Amino acid sequence: MSPSSSSPHAFRAIDVIRKKRDAIELSGEEIEGLVNGYTKGDIPDYQVSAWLMAVVLRGMTRPETAALTDAMLHSGEVLDLSSLRARKVDKHSTGGVGDKTSLVLAPLAAAAGVAVPMISGRGLGHTGGTLDKLEAIPGFNVNLPVVEFRRLLEVCGCAMIGQTAEIAPADRKLYALRDVTGTVESPYLICASIMSKKLAEGIDALVLDVKTGSGAFMKSEKDAAFLAELMVETGERMGKEVVALITDMDQPLGNMIGNALEVVEVVEVLRGAGPEDLRELCLELAGWMLHLGGVAKSVTEGKEKSARLIASGQALERFRQMVELQGGDPLIIDHANRLPKAQHTMQVQTNKSGYLGSMQCEHIGTACVILGGGRERKEDSVDPAVGIILHKKVGDRVDIGEPIATIYYNSEPKAERARQLVVASCEISESAPSKKRTLVHRVIGKSAGAD
């Protein structure tokens, strides 16, 4: 109902703002009225800004969070994928540096018989975006209409596209407002934003990769676990099977950061090679996707099946098929030189010998953004060729003059700024770290004991 209605029971945004300000629980109808009114343009930015700040300061109950997610979800189209016989499972990461697991997981799970309708995003802040990585593949089209998206799922079992205008329009409006009103960080608003988009895909189950550490948005494990529990419970309230893995982002995942470079590393993993940490996390997440997708009785069986699909080449062939169906050049899989390539390289060396004790992972991500691999402003275009290859991981021995990284660049001033950040991000200590951080810290969800 329009807020200007003269009915004695008319919805009034100011009443909802006051209740949230005073920490009084809102009903589902009140939250729905606010979301619908704002999406239609009946409620102005300044009132919704006030409500968002009240949410940041007062928080939300679990029923309120679920109601907000539901209202945002139903502000647009919810895909009907019931014609697909396979169970529909997606994976979502909260964002990290070098996090290219989606490009491995979609074809890998599809090769196992799970349908993967993946609607992804672009880079945010210091973190890379799945769409930017895919668009490093010449010709790859992420802007497919829903009809074509559904057709690709039937043919290939997986498809990876960007958010369409029809999906969760309330989220697009609310996110743009949060971005300029200091209200991005609320776990309740983050949960509703993520879950409304994911549930609009028409999925049966969802695997969440919630990052924690210096390169994550959630720096502490406590904050990451709170967000994970919130998203799992919200999804379960809406009838979906959801599991969340709290995973480490104190150093970049894999060795390559930058869009075209990360595609190279994805192909390496799908060939059964690539960095150990990236392979390990991909198999862990794939194990969960296959288990929730009903093609593996346990996560362990799902991991074993995934490893066999990689070893046999079936996962790589499914990736090749997806690339070709979405207009990309499939020859990049066997000829990496067909991917965009930077004109210059620069070695990054340390002036101290010892062990790589820790890494400010966010700085590495920011260095890649500075090179042009991400956006410093919303209107910036991304250079797919630039990036960083790390030659050392935390705990490795480092000697003076030995390269710890190579920068791939097209602008020397940007490369020098990036070099300084990479050097500053690496702490060299006299002794090796006492213990190696585990990649998966915790698993949250009703299915968490499915190993």
Label the predicted regions.
Residues S2-G98, V269-L270, R318-Q326, L439, ...:
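Acidic, glycine/proline-rich low-complexity segments that act as flexible tails and inter-domain linkers
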Residues D15, K20, E25-G28, Y38, ...:
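Well-ordered secondary-structure scaffolds
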Residues L52-V56, K133, D171-V180, D209-M218, ...:
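Active-site-proximal beta-alpha loop/turn segments in soluble metabolic enzymes
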Residues L57, L103-P117, K197-G202, R237-M238, ...:
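Alpha-helix C-terminal capping segments
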Residues R87-A110, V114-H126:
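Glycine/serine-rich anion-binding loops at beta->alpha junctions
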Residues I119, L153, I161-T164, I194, ...:
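Short beta-strand segments
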Residues K133-A159, E229-G235, G239:
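A glycine-rich helix N-cap at a beta->alpha junction
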Residues E154-I203:
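Phosphate/diphosphate-binding glycine-rich loops and adjacent basic-rich segments that engage nucleotide
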